[in-house]
């Protein structure tokens, strides 16, 4: 199975992740991971920190001469802003300074509930870890997951499907063409017809001192039928995907396939009819079974059915606003208006990269559970045997 933990604070020296379970023999490089880190830092509407941080990963263990060796993989992403925070965030008691305590909790953040839970009078102890800066190292972890999936010809593509109520229309393109289209967009959207309108909205919102959210969509193609399980609640793949998506900072809703729209339709207009053509298996398809629609989003009963996985997730507007919101000081109990030094106006494009990463992690985990081995070669043998079985099912 694919297990990982992340550690580190937003203004600490670095973010760290340890990944366990990756088989030996998988090609992996810092350069390939850095491509995804750069994508996360891009997108129209980002704030001042992106000018400070130019994320680069360091692989500290688990990889030798460009290939995994089967032991835990350690990744780290340095925080370049650390030089300005060494004393404020020092683990050493001699640097303690009670005069720099942050006692003004910001609406929409983890500040107040976190301080209440952990008995902190300085909400910096909460905001440093709850920050979306943590997603930098999660994207690095997701890049490792994607390397595994791509080895087995499973590909993912995340993009902005909606921004501030402006909806993009996804063109009928193959996965490679869709990724190429999104790569050309400053907003990581697949619909150039609405990109200008989206950028205009971001500019207007920025001028008003506000922020804007949106919806991201991730498609995974090449996923075989049979990942996940119906036998226990925590093995259902759609449940695991939903949890992973909701773990992303500022995400407030998840849909798989038709999602909430299915509730407004009759059953005959929701469920994907099943067809069979034996010749499809001999022409490159994994199986002779196929669908004309994909309202299920590639998952039925918690199990992949061979169609593309389609996940949508909603991101709320960033709660750090230049337009002050009212709050209360947790020490003095006096009201105040929250202020900010720097913030993104819109991070939805970056969020599409994070969503792509966490979906990759869940799919990689499900794939390893199904076809696991200690080496890539062993997994290949297991997978090849399963594909042969599917063709004749």
UniProtKB/Swiss-Prot annotation:
Pfam families xrefs: Chorismate_synt
Co-factor binding comment: Reduced FMN (FMNH(2)).
Q: What is its EC number?
A: 4.2.3.5
Which keywords, in A-to-Z order, does the entry hold? Amino-acid biosynthesis, Aromatic amino acid biosynthesis, FAD, Flavoprotein, FMN, Lyase, NADP
InterPro entries, per the entry? Chorismate_synth, Chorismate_synth_AroC_sf, Chorismate_synthase_CS
The protein's matches in CDD domains, at most eight in alphabetical order, are given as: Chorismate_synthase (cd07304)
Part of which pathway? Answer: Metabolic intermediate biosynthesis; chorismate biosynthesis; chorismate from D-erythrose 4-phosphate and phosphoenolpyruvate: step 7/7
Binding-site list for NADP(+): 40, 46
What is known about what this protein does?
A: This reaction introduces a second double bond into the aromatic ring system.
Q: Which family does it belong to?
A: Belongs to the chorismate synthase family.
Report the protein name in the record: Chorismate synthase
Organism of origin: Geotalea daltonii (strain DSM 22248 / JCM 15807 / FRC-32) (Geobacter daltonii)
